[in-house]
Amino acid sequence: MLDNRKFSEQELVRRNKYKTLVEQNKDPYKVTNWKRNTTLLKLNEKYKDYSKEDLLNLNQELVVVAGRIKLYREAGKKAAFVNIDDQDSSIQLYVRLDEIGDQSFEDFRNFDLGDIIGVKGIMMRTDHGELSIRCKEVVLLSKALRPLPDKHAGIQDIEEKYRRRYVDLIVNHDVRKTFQARTKIIRTLQNFLDNKGYMEVETPILHSLKGGASAKPFITHYNVLNTDVYLRIATELHLKRLIVGGFEGVYEIGRIFRNEGMSTRHNPEFTSIELYVAYEDMFFLMNLTEEIFRVCNAAVNSNSIIEYNNVKIDLSKPFKRLHMVDGIKQVTGVDFWKEMTVQQALELAKKHKVHVEKHQESVGHIINLFYEEFVESTIVEPTFVYGHPKEISPLAKSNPSDPRFTDRFELFILGREYANAFSELNDPIDQYERFKAQIEEESKGNDEANDMDIDFIEALEHAMPPTAGIGIGIDRLVMLLTNSESIKDVLLFPQMKPRE
């Protein structure tokens, strides 16, 4: 099976070129390093204002750089122009036979697009004014045995862009910039929280119970203990244990795993941040969330007004605040502020064609279904939707004025959820009853219900201070701030269906 690989004509030509190099004792794969003294970006910035004459009269030292060949064009039989890329920039090379020698020039003419080369030379400008390196030495550092896609067409198949991200990164500078922006956003967020005195921590990925969110878990088997365990669906319960333990501000940025669908907004493994701050409430987190979005945006964009899917969003304005029940009333006219029985709520659902599962037969669940069906998609500007029903918020503190609802909010922008936050439930007796209600829901078909976590209950019984907690989807935040249409555009290696 391993010997059945088939190669295109162009791939065979490249392999024959490599074979010849090996026979000539010039195997590029045996090169162990190439000590650069600068980068292409630094060269472009340093010499951008130098004229052709300035460079001719300049007492220059050799520049030593490296990059991938992206363009090759001959200028007669004894010279050629080549464009190379490195991580952050590109530059033109001017290669002449009389400067690098007969044998080196002959080797050079056998280089292919995609090959990685090392270069030594001095800076110049062409007659057309293009900044270039006049090469004194050109060395093949790695041979590309596969050709690159056509430079104008690129990768036409969107699936191939995601499957072969390495090729996408080679041919598309903008894709590289998106992932550099992602890293900058995460670093900015870490620095912002560190400067506030919060501590970054790491908690387990393998959990013996499912909890901390309403989601379907991945299950794996732990051989040594001969038991099934879950890949975490949230970091919440471990982080709150740390608040019990005496830390007053903790956060974790890490991978979360949910055994659910894939779409432009969902990937089964994704990155989130969860933050817990003692002695604060959800209103504190509303203000902090606005700060987070603004400081992360400033790290990658020069304007507080961003554009996403052709809609302009002003992140400098205060985010709106909307109670879930008020939003439903505004859009549908249905008033869930009124006390009502489950039967009355079911009749309203039937009238408005809202589907209700068996485990959702409660007023709180039906309120949430109305919100998701009619209100969520109408939200454009950044809006904190708060006041979620108790039934769908098993870890949030009940609102003291109306215990049907909780002190919880979600941040929505353009119909998408970006954050979920609570004034955290710290009453162990209430938490125990909420877990029992979750078990009851599971028996009625809710496969996203939380398990009973007695250890967490016991932690709360040691007293957790009033605490505010929030989760923010890093991938969606990056999508928003880089104007990326799909979550796959901000994940280096998104989950893909197996090839047929």
UniProtKB/Swiss-Prot annotation:
Q: Which residues bind Mg(2+) 2?
A: 417
Q: Which superkingdom heads the taxonomic lineage of this protein's source?
A: Bacteria
Any binding details for the cofactor?
Binds 3 Mg(2+) ions per subunit.
Localization of this protein: Cytoplasm
Name the GO cellular-component terms.
cytosol
- Where it mainly occurs, coarsely classed, is cytoplasm
Look up the record and give one Gene Ontology term from the biological process aspect: lysyl-tRNA aminoacylation
Kindly give the SUPFAM superfamilies that the UniProt entry links to this protein: Class II aaRS and biotin synthetases, Nucleic acid-binding proteins
Annotated residues for binding of Mg(2+) 1: 410, 417
Q: Name one GO molecular function term.
A: magnesium ion binding
Gene3D superfamilies in the record? Bira Bifunctional Protein, Domain 2, Nucleic acid-binding proteins
Keywords annotated in UniProt = Aminoacyl-tRNA synthetase, ATP-binding, Cytoplasm, Ligase, Magnesium, Metal-binding, Nucleotide-binding, Protein biosynthesis
Uppermost EC category? ligase
Q: What is its EC number?
A: 6.1.1.6
Q: What are the names of the required cofactors?
A: Mg(2+)
Under the heading Pfam families, the entry gives: tRNA-synt_2, tRNA_anti-codon
From the UniProt record, list the reaction(s) this protein catalyses. tRNA(Lys) + L-lysine + ATP = L-lysyl-tRNA(Lys) + AMP + diphosphate
**What interactions and quaternary structure are annotated?**
Homodimer.
Q: Output the HAMAP family linked to this UniProt entry.
A: Lys_tRNA_synth_class2
Q: Show the NCBIfam families listed in the entry.
A: lysS_bact, PRK00484.1
Q: Which family does it belong to?
A: Belongs to the class-II aminoacyl-tRNA synthetase family.
Matching entries from PANTHER family are given as: LYSINE--TRNA LIGASE, CHLOROPLASTIC_MITOCHONDRIAL, LYSYL-TRNA SYNTHETASE
Protein name per UniProt: Lysine--tRNA ligase
